[in-house]
């Protein structure tokens, strides 16, 4: 089972918005040095919505190759077309991803039965561990706990990234899910509490900026060292907040650029961080120890 800090990796781009492979390779190595436990390639934070299919798969392959088996790589392969999600998931498996993360179908707003059948179909089509991803604030559809628990019985479905920040929902899932079905936070601010309830880790935006701190926070929480984990989280709360002053990944890409790790590229319709938020993000980074 994949546990701990799973960075939702940004996708580096040159100023002209072409993909920056050198920076991607360096970012992967930096995360390995900093103790990140797994890498999520081409999720929301990785700008999956504005990468074409070839770019999407190239990023996954390059991350897999650079990691070279040292930590797990989870590939973002969700789509609002079931057949497209199957193709992406199979392609990610073919290039060596350890698991896939599949966001609930967005915009077309399927019913709960539609969500179940969508994910069941993909799980039956491709034999790779698959994590459901529930983020209703972005998709316009909320996978109810009952649906997630039905899917937890389906072979190849390994867990869920629950990004609502609702700890009561997380508690219900943790209490009722079968053994081996992972509940993973998709909300940095509440990740410690979810892990302490019995969750397995945090698919983290903030880990792009302070990977060692998020890794340590997750390790402490998994070990049941609640106060120590909470102490780290309290220090990071301004940074968690700053990462969402504008739509993700706008703030986090700007922050990683300030660290000198990537260039300024971000693809329309996303834009660079508005000047009015620069100081807030800088201050949050300083409070986090940077």
Curated annotation (Swiss-Prot):
Residues holding pyruvate: 45, 203
Lineage: superkingdom: Bacteria
Known function: Catalyzes the condensation of (S)-aspartate-beta-semialdehyde [(S)-ASA] and pyruvate to 4-hydroxy-tetrahydrodipicolinate (HTPA).
Pathways per UniProt: Amino-acid biosynthesis; L-lysine biosynthesis via DAP pathway; (S)-tetrahydrodipicolinate from L-aspartate: step 3/4
Subunit structure: Homotetramer; dimer of dimers.
Membership in a protein family: Belongs to the DapA family.
GO cellular component: cytosol
Active-site residues, Swiss-Prot/TrEMBL: 133 (proton donor/acceptor), 161 (schiff-base intermediate with substrate)
SMART domains: DHDPS (SM01130)
HAMAP family, per database record: DapA
PROSITE patterns cross-referenced by the UniProt entry: DHDPS_1 (PS00665), DHDPS_2 (PS00666)
Keyword Metal-binding (UniProt): no
InterPro entries documented for this protein: Aldolase_TIM (IPR013785), DapA (IPR005263), DapA-like (IPR002220), Schiff_base-form_aldolases_AS (IPR020625), Schiff_base-form_aldolases_CS (IPR020624)
Catalytic activity: L-aspartate 4-semialdehyde + pyruvate = (2S,4S)-4-hydroxy-2,3,4,5-tetrahydrodipicolinate + H2O + H(+)
One of the record's GO molecular function terms: 4-hydroxy-tetrahydrodipicolinate synthase activity
A Pfam family hit: DHDPS
Entry-linked CDD domains: DHDPS
PANTHER family: 4-HYDROXY-2-OXOGLUTARATE ALDOLASE, MITOCHONDRIAL, DIHYDRODIPICOLINATE SYNTHASE
GO biological process: diaminopimelate biosynthetic process; lysine biosynthetic process via diaminopimelate
Organism this protein belongs to: Cellvibrio japonicus (strain Ueda107) (Pseudomonas fluorescens subsp. cellulosa)
The protein's name: 4-hydroxy-tetrahydrodipicolinate synthase
